[in-house]
């Protein structure tokens, strides 16, 4: 087997291989790219590399992408690599070949890109990926080392209780205007992510670029919470990724079957949204750029986003365990899928200082829509 860099004319083969595999969990999902396969990566950066693992007969048996961007690491911004979309055919040979190719690849990219640190998110219920990558059986193999940076959950907000309290009356909640609000919004995002690992370099220009590169995202997507003095104290931007990536139900497993029946029954009372049948597409919004000064403001923004989305969609966001502000409020029905964010290091790379920091640290600046 050989590792090859994907090119634009590989788009069709990539989308076909990608659609054949499923993400395993409480609900097995099929992921499809309706447009160009690479559009998902351009949401985050124009600098990315997709690699194909091919057999001697040129059949694709594995893919993975590394996206490069500037991010904050302890005391400065530097280039990081985010490893995503790892798909390997379910054969021992393909898995072994991929892990053997991965370390030389990281060392090559470190030299070419000046990128010393790589990151990746893995679902904690994906046993095959966990055993192959995070907990390999042989410690003598020359493979990358995975160090847990933080644990988080993908929270799906499926419904709201009928007597849920309203948002705080002391807040002004409104939609943003790019010309009038993006400078103040960027300043707020910088304040909320200051000193946090993987933080972006927020500016008004950064936000405007996202409007240009995220299909369907406008300044009106941004919902601002302001105090009585007009200061921004929270924000969220619901966004539908269907133009670049869709998720459909391949199979419901275990408790998720009961959950679907319950949700669909409660949908008759308009307390929840209906969950789709097998083969149907999930209809949801990511809650992007989600920050709040306290849990009450977080609740108020979630309430407003839910009002805007219902009855056709549910809402999805990431909640890091160390961040109590973003825990799903009890007034909402929510399902959770556990994940971990890892730092991926070559065996030759020494342990960085940011991994030696106290175990309880602020949550990284992580945008679930870019997972």
Cite the ranges covered by each PLM segment.
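Short amphipathic alpha-helix that is part of the acyltransferase structural core
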Residues: 1-52, 60, 82, 158-206, ...
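A short helix-loop-beta-strand connector motif used in the catalytic cores of GNAT acetyltransferases and
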Residues: 38-52, 62, 211-223, 243, ...
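GNAT/GCN5-related N-acetyltransferase fold signature
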Residues: 53, 66-68, 88, 225, ...
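Conserved beta-strand in the GNAT
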Residues: 59-69, 82, 230-240
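Conserved acetyl-CoA-binding loop-helix of GNAT-fold acetyltransferases
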Residues: 88, 93-108, 295-308
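Contiguous mid-protein beta-loop-alpha structural module that forms a pocket-lining wall or clamp
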Residues: 92, 101-201, 212-214, 218
